[in-house]
Amino acid sequence: MSLGIDISTWQDVRDYGTLLGQVDYVLLKASGSNTGSNYVDSKYHRHANAIGGRKPTGSYYMNGASDATSAARFFVSNLNSNADDFAVLDIETIDGYAYWSPAKSLEWVHEVRRLGYTGPVFAYMNTSVAQSADWSALERAGVGLWLANYGQDNGSLTSPSPGAGSWSTWQVHQYTQQGRLAGYAGPLDLNRAKAGIFTSMPSANDPATFWSAKRWIISGLAG
């Protein structure tokens, strides 16, 4: 499987070259509404421009106060072209806001695609959220599961079979918040992705049958 990190305003990366040399892809926090209104993460564009296309890079939106349509429009309008290889909706209870329902989450996905985004789309959630609702409508729409399940959360993989709740399977597994990699002094979220998922998720044109290869091919990572 391939190794990836996700970073946001909390990660003040200085040595991007060393850090990128150890990972296969990067997910950046782009925007969200968990503070009460839509905002752009303060380090989003810095991270995206520093990475500069050297690795497959995606962006995520954190759910919160906004309605789904406005949130999708805000996300797309602020999407950095250096970080548009895949899109992720972060679905979680945070800062007093309940996690978005499957219907609201699907509305966000549909609006993102209506606005012209054709890359792979994922829904990020922990095991509890994955088990607490029926997410099959998102899966039928071609959305993949980015599952957070940390096990012992000690920097290593301690939950090799995390399950998938109401989903048929997961595509990416965030397995620790305590990862350590050269090039960054603090803890990092580490993720393992199944081989080829960033180029084999269904496209917006025909989720059931058309498999897109947007910009990158992650090769040699089967496992």
Regions found by a protein language model. Give the residues of each.
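Short beta-alpha junction loops
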Residues: 65, 93-95, 125-130, 151-152
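C-terminal, disordered and strongly charge-biased linear tails with low hydrophobicity
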Residues: 215-223
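Functionally critical loop-and-helix segments that line ligand-binding/catalytic clefts
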Residues: 1-17, 136-216
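Glycine-rich, charge-decorated loop segments at or immediately adjacent to ligand/cofactor-binding or catalytic sites
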Residues: 70, 129-140
